[in-house]
Curated annotation (Swiss-Prot):
Protein function: Required for the assembly and/or stability of the 40S ribosomal subunit. Required for the processing of the 20S rRNA-precursor to mature 18S rRNA in a late step of the maturation of 40S ribosomal subunits.
InterPro entries for this protein: Ribosomal_uS2, Ribosomal_uS2_CS, Ribosomal_uS2_euk, Ribosomal_uS2_euk/arc, Ribosomal_uS2_flav_dom_sf
Highest taxon listed in the record's lineage: Eukaryota
Binding partners and assembly: Component of the small ribosomal subunit. Mature ribosomes consist of a small (40S) and a large (60S) subunit. The 40S subunit contains about 33 different proteins and 1 molecule of RNA (18S). The 60S subunit contains about 49 different proteins and 3 molecules of RNA (25S, 5.8S and 5S). Interacts with ribosomal protein S21.
Protein's name according to its UniProt entry: Small ribosomal subunit protein uS2y
Family recorded in the similarity comment: Belongs to the universal ribosomal protein uS2 family.
Main location as per UniProt: cytoplasm
Species of origin: Arabidopsis thaliana
UniProt KW rRNA-binding keyword: no
Gene: RPSaB
Any one GO MF annotation of this record: structural constituent of ribosome
């Protein structure tokens, strides 16, 4: 039993270290030049250029806490993940796709959580936001409706009405995508959808923001490939595409149909005699 416990602890440590290395490569640790007094506990140090460095060990712990809260809600449709920042819209849609929660990508419609006369009115049990500054409207409405809020908070983010603040860089496209990918994987592991020791087959690149020009360029390239391997049109078809060997063979004669029972063919089908009975 003790050996199994040590092995499990070693696996968890290695997984945490791998996640921290991924967050380092995605610049999750880079804060801003300003620091809110409520975010000082999550700051590791300050660089010479004035940028605050976030302690990624505490970021990973807060991701685990947020995943436990998400798993504790029975119906995933009672959770709304939202991002008004363009860099986080693709990430929230992918997070909603793999975890089953509802996503709102784009501008928040005022009154979504407070005005019952609206068609888009909703009463979620949990709210997940990308940035407390850009998503200030849903935070205020969630506070009026007593909705718990989870948010990715930078060093200068306001912490008012935020129940679980995950310290991280919430302004970079790679950082936001990496955070939502890690949170989605932790949620699926706690639900038992994927094994803890099993590597998730979904790439983190799918959660990254893509420029519209880049997506359009890839779409044009796919269209060109389909045009190259498409069928030849009627105006482009020529006999040169058929080899000479295909023309030299003899044409097979069609199989003649068997004569109908009771019908006598004399000289041809025109002169066939009409049967005496059986047509009725």
């Amino acid at each position: 039993m003790a050996a199994n416990g040590v092995a499990t602890a070693g696996r968890q440590v290695s997984e945490k270290e791998a996640d921290i290395q991924m967050m380092l490569s995605a610049d999750v640790h880079l804060g801003t030049k300003n620091c809110n007094y409520q975010m000082e506990r999550y700051v590791f140090k300050r660089r010479d250029d004035g940028i605050y460095i976030i302690n990624l060990g505490k970021t990973w712990d807060k991701l685990q806490m947020a995943a436990r809260v998400i798993v504790a809600i029975e119906n995933p449709k009672d959770i709304i993940v939202q991002s008004a920042r363009p860099y986080g819209q693709r990430a929230v849609l992918k997070f909603a796709q793999y975890t089953g929660v509802n996503a709102i990508a784009g501008r928040h419609t005022p009154g979504t959580f407070t005005n019952q006369m609206q068609t888009s009115f909703s009463e979620p049990r949990l709210l997940i936001l990308t940035d407390p500054r850009t998503d200030h409207q849903p935070i205020k409405e969630g506070a009026l409706g007593n909705i718990p809020t989870i948010a990715f908070c930078d060093t200068d983010s306001p912490m008012g009405f935020v129940d679980i603040g995950i310290p991280a860089n919430n302004k970079g496209k790679h950082s936001i995508g990496c955070l939502f990918w890690l949170l989605a994987r932790m949620v699926l592991q706690m639900r038992g959808t994927i094994l803890a020791a099993q590597k998730w087959d979904v790439m983190v690149d799918l959660f990254f923001y893509r420029e519209p020009e880049e997506a359009k360029q890839e779409g044009d390239e796919e269209a060109e490939v389909q045009a190259d391997y498409g069928m030849v049109g009627g105006d482009q078809w020529t006999t040169a595409q058929i080899s000479d060997a295909a023309w030299s063979g003899e044409v097979e004669q069609p199989i003649s149909a068997a004569p109908a029972v009771g019908v006598t063919v004399a000289a041809g089908w025109e002169a066939a005699s009409v049967p005496a009975a059986g047509w009725e």
